[in-house]
Amino acid sequence: VYDEPNCFDSFMAHYGKFTNVSNYIAIVGAKNDQEKAGYYGEKLVLGCQELGLNTCWVAMSHGKTKAVIGKGQKLLIVIALGYGENQGVAHKSKDISEISRADVETDWFTKGMEAVCLAPTAVNQQKFMFELKDEMVTAKAPRGICTKIDLGIAKYHFEAGSGHKIFTK
C-alpha cells in the first residue's frame, strides 16, 4: 500500500515508535497461511533491504489498513517500508543451543542456525525449535501470537544460510 499514512497514525503505532511511515506491504491470506506469510514476506523484506529500503515487521502496533481483504482472508501481518532515520538496531538473540538440537554437528546446520539468530521476528521473540536428526532438519513453533509467522521468517533464514531445505513431517 503506497502513500497511506493513516495505518501508522494510531496510539499503537506511536507505541511502536513509527514516524512518517506511509508505505507498507500488507500480507493477506487464509488464517492458516501464517507460516507462508513469514517465509515469503521475509524473502520480500530482504529484497527490499538489498534495494536500500528499510523494513519492519509490524504485528500489533499499527492501525487500520487499506489492504484489500477478500472473503475467507484476513490481514496476517504488515511490513513497514521506506527510508529509515538509521539502519536499525541489532536485536537480542537467543543462543543457538536454546533454539536448536542436533544429533551430529555439521557446518551447514551451524551456518543455518547462525542465520536464524539474525532473523527478525514479528514480536521480538524466538519461540521456535530447529532439530537436525538423521540428516533431516525439522522446525516447529508452539501456539502463540505470531509464532507461525516467526517460524516462517526463521525457516527462510535457515535455508538461505545453510543451503538446505527444511523437511516437514
Residue ranges and their predicted role:
Residues 1-169:
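Acidic, surface-exposed loops and disordered segments
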